[in-house]
């Protein structure tokens, strides 16, 4: 799935650049600039749908990639793993600031709710939030800086990806048995290149199908209404790929406690290399660990479902 993530990143950067050429980062114009893009720009609708749904596929791939890393003990390549977790955090930040850009209702209120969480930090929280907003509420300065960040972060992700690959190259990749595979090495081309092309095809076909047949399936209908600071949507929720974390956040009555639990649900990945005590690397021959692993997967799916 690493190669698929690379393709996702490339697709997102290309479609994103094309979108940025027509986008206006201003509260009075952002919503209509996106509408203009879908109506008046050649293939603008397609580029936007690919970009919006490409994000979903990016997260599907990264979650499977992490799950596979957990299952096969890839986290024992500590540097690679830690850079990977930082990549995940950067990707989540990018997706969040990107979701705010169309300036629909859910964009505005999502931005308000999530940035407001920083106010739970003792002593400096409120100052931090007002500093992030550039004022006393989510407004034009917020949109402008979010656009700047959304433009910048994917290139940071590209840089981190190269670091990720450099560290991986030090050790070589892992395999399902978790044993050294030096004696089984084969040329990248044609073997791996063919395997990767198959993966690309298997990902691009559903992505194209989603973007062409039901582009709004995963989006929130609230976002077709321009942002209105005076009208709160009945239920504020993020895109599906953040729902598991959002469910954790909302299940804890205390604000700071919820924020800490939300952060911990992602940052726990940093601890995993330290928690590995088995003599075997992968879970292939460890049924008990397999049960726990699949329970974790089921848990995340249930949280995603509950969060919506």
UniProtKB/Swiss-Prot annotation:
Residues given in the record as heme b b566 binding sites: 65, 164
Co-factor: note: Binds 2 heme b groups non-covalently.
TM spans (from-to): 1-21, 45-66, 81-101, 146-166, 194-214, 256-276, 288-308
Family annotation (SUPFAM superfamilies): a domain/subunit of cytochrome bc1 complex (Ubiquinol-cytochrome c reductase), Transmembrane di-heme cytochromes
Entry membrane topology: Multi-pass membrane protein
An example Gene Ontology molecular-function term: ubiquinol-cytochrome-c reductase activity
GO CC aspect terms: mitochondrial inner membrane
Binding site for a ubiquinone: 169
PROSITE patterns to which the protein is assigned, alphabetical: CYTB_CTER, CYTB_NTER
PANTHER family, per database record: CYTOCHROME B
The protein, known as: Cytochrome b
């Amino acid at each position: 799935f690493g190669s698929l993530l690379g393709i996702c990143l490339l697709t997102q950067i290309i479609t994103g650049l094309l979108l940025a050429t027509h986008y206006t980062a201003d509260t009075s114009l952002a919503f209509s600039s996106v509408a203009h893009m879908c109506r008046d720009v050649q293939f603008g609708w397609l580029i936007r749908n690919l970009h919006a749904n490409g994000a979903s596929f990016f997260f599907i791939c990264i979650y499977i990639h992490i799950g596979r890393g957990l299952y096969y003990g890839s986290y024992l390549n500590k540097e690679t793993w830690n850079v990977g977790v930082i990549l995940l955090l950067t990707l989540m930040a990018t997706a969040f600031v990107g979701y705010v850009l169309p300036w629909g209702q859910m964009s505005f209120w999502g931005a308000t709710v999530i940035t407001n969480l920083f106010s739970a930090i003792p002593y400096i929280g409120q100052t931090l939030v007002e500093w992030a907003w550039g004022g006393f509420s989510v407004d034009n300065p917020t949109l402008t800086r979010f656009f700047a960040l959304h433009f910048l972060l994917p290139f940071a992700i590209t840089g981190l990806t190269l670091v990720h690959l450099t560290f991986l190259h030090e050790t070589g990749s892992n395999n399902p048995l978790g044993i050294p595979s030096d004696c089984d090495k084969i040329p990248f081309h044609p073997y791996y290149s063919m395997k990767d092309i198959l993966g690309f095809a298997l990902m691009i076909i559903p992505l194209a199908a989603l973007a062409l047949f039901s582009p709004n399936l995963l989006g929130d209908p609230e976002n077709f209404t321009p942002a209105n600071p005076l009208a709160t949507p009945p239920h504020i929720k993020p895109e599906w790929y953040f729902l598991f974390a959002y469910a954790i956040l909302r299940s804890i009555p205390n604000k700071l406690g919820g924020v800490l639990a939300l952060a911990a649900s992602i940052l726990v990945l940093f601890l995993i290399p330290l928690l590995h005590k088995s003599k075997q690397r992968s879970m292939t021959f460890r049924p008990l660990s397999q049960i726990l692993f699949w329970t974790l997967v089921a848990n995340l799916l249930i949280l995603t479902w509950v969060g919506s």
